[in-house]
Amino acid sequence: MEEVAAKVEEETVETNVDAVKEDNATIANESRSPESVSAVSVVSNRAASTKKKPVISSNLIKPTASSSLRVSGTTPVTIRRNSTGGVTENLAGTSKVLPKQVSTTASRTDPVRRSLPELRKSSVSSLSAKTVSKPSLSESKKSVPVSPGSRSLTKSTGFSLSKPESSARPAMSVSVSSKRAPSSSVDSSGSRTSSGRLHSTLTSGRTVSKVSSPSAGSSPSVSSSIRSKSFSSPLDRTSNFSGRKKTSTPESRDSRLIILPKVEVKAGDDMRLDLRGHRIRSLTSGGLHLSPNLEFVYLRDNLLSTLEGIEILNRVKVLDLSFNDFKGPGFEPLENCKMLQQLYLAGNQITSLASLPQLPNLEFLSVAQNKLKSLAMASQPRLQVLAASKNKITTLKDFPYLPVLEHLRVEENPLLKISHLEAASILLVGPTLKKFNDRDLSREEVAIAKRYPPQTALCLREGWEFCKSDLAAESTFRFLVERWKDTLPSGYLIKEAHVDRPSEEAPCQCHFGLFQESPTATDQELALKFQWSVADRSLSNFVPILNATKEVYWPKREDIGKILKIECTPVMAETEYPSIFAISSPVQRGKGIPKVVSLELNGELVEGNIIKGQAVVAWCGGTPGKCITSWLRRKWNGSPVVIDGAEDEEYMLSLDDVGSSMVFMYTPVTEGGARGEPQYKYTEFVKAAPPSVSNVRITGDAVEGCVLKGVGDYFGGKEGPSKFEWLRKNKETGELSLISAGTSEYTLTQEDVGTHVTFVYIPANFEGLEGEPVSTSSSVVKPAPPKVTDAKIVGDLRENSKVTVTGTVTGGTEGSSRVQWFKSSCSILEGDNSLEELSTSKVAKSFRIPLGAVGYYIVAKYTPMTPDGECGEPVYVLSERAVETLPPSLNFLSITGDNIEGGILTASYGYIGGHEGKSKYEWHYHKAENDLPGALIPEASGLLQYTITKEAIGKFISFQCIPVRDDGIVGEPRSCMSQERVRPGNPSTVSLHVVGALVEGTMLSAEKEYWGGEEGASVFRWFRTNSDGTPCEIKGATTSSYLLSVGDIGYFISVSYEPVRNDRARGPTAISEIAGPIVAGHPNCQSLEFLGSMIEGQRLSFVASYTGGMKGNCYLEWVRVKNNGVKEILSSDEFLDLSLDDVGESIELIYTPVREDGIEGSPRSIRTDGIAPANPMGLELLIPDCCEKQEVVPHKTYFGGHEGVGEYIWYRTKVKLHGSALTEISYAGEEVVVCCRTLKYTPSLEDVGAYLVLYWIPTRVDGRSGKPVVVITNSPVAPADPEVSNVRVKKLFSDAYSGEGEYFGGHEGPSLFSWYRENDGTIDLIDGANSKTYEVTESDYNCRILFGYTPVRSDSVVGELKMSEPTEIILPEVPKVDMLAFTGKAVQGDVLTAVQVIPKTEIQQLVWSKYKGDIQYQWFRSPESGDKISYEALSSEISCSYKVRFEDIGRCLKCECVVHDVFGRSSELAYAETDPISPGFPRIEKLEIEGQGFHTNLYAVRGNYFGGKEGKSKIQWLRSMVGSPDLISIPGETGRMYEANVDDVGYRLVVVYTPIREDGVQGHPVSASTEPVAVEPDILKEVRQKLETGLVKFEVLCDKDPYPKKIVGEGNLERRMLEMNRKRIKVVKPGSKTSFATTEVRGSYGPPFHVETFRNDQRRLRIVVDSENEVDIVVQSRHLRDVIVLVIRGFAQRFNSTSLNSLLKIDT
């Protein structure tokens, strides 16, 4: 049920906002009083023609009427305005109500919040009700939970059925259809008739009951229909039932008005009040009882003029005050109605909504049909629909802030004269606006609104006049400047005020330009204070942003989509002036790509200092990540080079940076990896630091004879010639004396012993600048200990040689110095750690080199000692080269061991010559002692021992050693040979055992291992042992193998072996272990052979031999093996008959032996070669009865392998052949005819009546042929039944046709022909047309003809009539066009007309006159290149005429023409081409001047040029006095724009436009003029005031330059007072402390007095009294200049009749 209800609801529920159509019709229909019309049933015209959908009823209720409808025919009628705008009508009648139930559809839950303004459409199929005449039928019903005004229903609404308490209680019935009806107006939704308005809204958890009117006796019954989401009142749609879209007068609509009784929503008396049309004048009257519980109050069509008393309705949600006498203001009492959602104020006399308070829940407001001049009111935060049609609204000024407004209606207001009003409304309301004046927003208007600057909405609300978008930026700025100019500091003007386009997390800067207008500057400095604010819309309240008080603001993420406002407050001398502001466009979402706004480098660019880079990054919506920084160094004339490791924001300048410019590179990176553009920042060149030195020290031992070195850490650019000094302190005087200079090294002498040595370091840079000297002192210099010099090693550096260390000892007399020897693998001494001891420390200085020192360097540690035991520093002496070794050699070589097979020989030798490496060992065989070098024994190579093998028996054995040193040096080889030959060993058996399966039929082998020389004829014997262990030799078994037989079953087998050497020496006999018992063998087929011929048709059998116990039932299978390996089992018989399927295949026999106990042996198989085929032969050949054109398939049987392509010959013979004549038919004469050489044959007409013979030679697939087989038919070939096919009509000429067909069925006789005519599916025989040809007559036009063919055989057998397919419709000739010609000239603007030239033939003249239909045209244009080969179609140009346009100039035009006749056919394409189009004569069309008509406005000339491409056309602006034909040229004004000035006042501006084509051709000049130029209103007002006073003074600056033609400068201006009255004018020099005021220029307004202005300087004017008295004046602004000029001319006009033309002089 809910699904059906939802469907009904979906089709019926729509908003009342879309229902707004036309206010006149709506007001008239809605305003009719429901009490004045009898209730009748209504059926919608649209609903009547639409299939009704089922209506589901749930919890039915039975409402009752609260009062009866009483209308007296004699009751006096008070004439007053009601909701229809007219007077009430007198209707007499009585209505009855039949007791019926109310059926309504329960609304399904709608998750989308819907309020009344959002409902779009609804439909009522039929409503019927009757009114009860009894007044006292009020009764409360069960509560219905509804949610008034709510936009989201959380529960579906149901209605409970209430049974009537008495049988006399009537009821009303309403049926609701799902048919859609056109929607009604929103503007007058507050003025709907009381019985049709859906005032009740569904409430959750509330009780709604029927309300009885307090004046039941005189007023009609009050009820309302049910609104379930979107049911609209049938009365609201009265015009819908008669065609909603039609418009008519109110009277005509009234005649169709049908009033329905209202259906009561079960609203309780305490929640609902309906007093419509009760002439109530005050809400505080005694008879009106307003309750705080009321939620639905309907007070329309009364006489209320004040809202006093309405404040008690603090819970009201729907308030209808339409069609009363409210004039406003006085809406303050509504402030207490916080729950109000819908307010209807239509049809009153309201002039202003300024007093309407802010209603936090108001969603719908109707103020249509009032006298509002503007929509100024308090902000309504939830208002969605504002209906303000039929008012007097003229301006958008003070438009309220409506943040969620969706629908705005302002039809029939003067405001509609504003161009692009819809775009202005979009700007004021914002993106929530969906509909304007009952239409969806126009895309064009939305696009136009986007072109306006951000401050447009604010300016509109402040009263700015809406203008074109391209002028809006300048116009709104001027508007704001005009508002601000009086609040700015004195002398300051605003030059600019705008904000950059804001983007997320990117700097947004404001631009305010204030400059001084006055030339005299003040000493006070102007400062600007800033404050940024943010708001959702430009008209909403801006909220200041905390700490956003700078010129630049960085929008945050929460600012996206919002509007920024920057307020700039001028401050001068601690005085704050009113702020000015600028509005931004909505904040855009950042692109996520960061960018660097600025880079700064801090730090002094001096060597050793730290500089730091700081970046200001706009992250543009990205999350800051780890950015990439790097430092680069750039030389003066080089490119930047990256500094390795310098990747931090801080960098310490080093020596390498001196003279270079540092480059800081910064690349912003977000966390997501998005990189911005890298930015660079260059520094100045780095300077070197002043020279200095630190960490000065002395290295070396302070001992006599040692060398001291002074060192220090230099800093300060590149080091230059620094100075060094060595000083020694005098022991007696303590003074320092210079002992060395210019070097950093000093060798201590005997004089230095016991003193301190001082080292002085004076740093100097490369430029010679010296720094502060730094000094340091050494420790006390000590005397030198004993020391060895010139130490060296003497002797031969070879293995086992003696060497000696020598040296000179200083530092006293040498005592028992000690020497210790080492070896070292390095040729350079690197300390004690790399030395390896060879001896202990001894006094002896000689040493014999051991073997371990070979390859090493010899090191001697020489420790000098004095006789008193003082030791000096040891000295290490390294030999010049490494110790060499002797060449490798052997000092002895021998072989020990027994020379017998199996014996082991061992070789030993003595090696000398350094460390032995991998010496080489080899053993050799020698047949004799002189057999050298012998045969190498490979397996013994590299071994010192050799085990003699059998191969060495009888041979000598030798051993050879090749000494090899560890360095790879090879010595001389040396050999040693055994003294005797190798003897063989005694024969013996190493191992013996029986090998093989102990099964009958298996071959056993004796596996043995012999040793003892070469084996001879050893002896084997086999033994059989029974179960009691008694062995028995097996006779004849004397070999190494034995085949088990049946006799061995159950016994054990063993073998004996007696080894015999080849020299017949015998060894002991060995017996193997017994093996057994022997078991019976597995059944086996030892042989298998085929018997028989392997040819197709032969029988194949086999012969098999069996072993393995007693034979049982053996298995066998015959298998066919195909060439592809696939096997097919054929049979299991003892034989196989070969067939055709076996030919070429192999036959395999599988034989499985089976023992009698059922044990199966291994299958054995044999296979044949391919089975050969038999000789080919034909076994059978038959020919069935033959008939013409019926294929004959003979029946044949072949044998002899696979049949190949045999030879078939069909013969035709008139007589039947027999015997040899038949078998030898191939030799027959001409009476026999060969017909075919295929197996199958189809008899033809020639074969009818003859016999057919088939000659067949059977052929095998390999080409071998058999004997031929011949057969003849039993009877002659019979003819076929007569028939005809392919019956068709062939067109001979345009008016002649021929019938054709293909006859079949024996020989044709006199066949019959006929012709038919087909028209609209009816086929009629054409009389007299019985031949094969037919000539078309006029009766055949637009018809089709058919040809009929009845076949007749020669024997008079008649066949079936066959008809051809209908021809195409017989039509006359297609219209032809001889040629296509043009009328008109190929000139821009001219009209070309295509005309056809008709052929003069009679038939074509007839066709064109009688059968011509439409003619289609298509125009084409060639490309710009002028290529006539290709054209582009002009899709819209499809008429015979074409007006040549501008874009056609220089191109060729082509027109294609196709003529269609009345039969739908088309002629061949005809076309005509033009020459290249020439441009038209230049002219200007629709010339006009645009401008607002004041002397301060900008005027522009507009017109449409015609005549090719416009060249340098001439424009001249002129003035014209009203009523005078004279024109005064304005010099220099030849542009399309003209800025008017004060000299134009009272004149018409005239522009003369002379069009000139680009090739110089000049057209006729055209002029346009304006209305007389008026004074700008503000200036006019000011001038009138001054003229009325009669005495005016101005403070001006006077130009005292003696050369007035020069440009006025600021330095030659002096202050003067300009005084004027109605009679005279004078220029007065003000007085000072030293002088009185003096009059410099005085004069009256008589001729030649005049005032001149200067177009190049709008602040300057010249007053000319006469030829000798004139003065140049400079004022502060153009405005003041214009006021002065107009005031002077105003005074002058009274006394001077001179035409103003002589007064308007312009400086050129």
UniProtKB/Swiss-Prot annotation:
Its main location: cytoplasm. PROSITE patterns: LRR. Residues 67-255 are annotated as: Disordered. GO terms for cellular component: cortical microtubule; phragmoplast; plasma membrane; plasmodesma; preprophase band. Residues 122-134, 173-234 have a biased composition (Low complexity). Residues 67-93, 149-165 have a biased composition (Polar residues). LRR repeats lie at residues 267-290, 291-315, 316-335, 337-359, 360-382, 384-402, 403-425. A9 repeats lie at residues 489-584, 601-682, 698-777, 793-878, 895-977, 994-1073, 1090-1167, 1183-1272, 1287-1365, 1382-1473, 1489-1569. Disruption phenotype: No visible phenotype. Residues 110-121 have a biased composition (Basic and acidic residues). Microtubule-associated protein that may be involved in the maturation of cell plates and proper insertion of cross-walls after cytokinesis. This is 187-kDa microtubule-associated protein AIR9. It comes from Arabidopsis thaliana. The lineage of its organism: Eukaryota, Viridiplantae, Streptophyta, Embryophyta, Tracheophyta. The gene is AIR9.
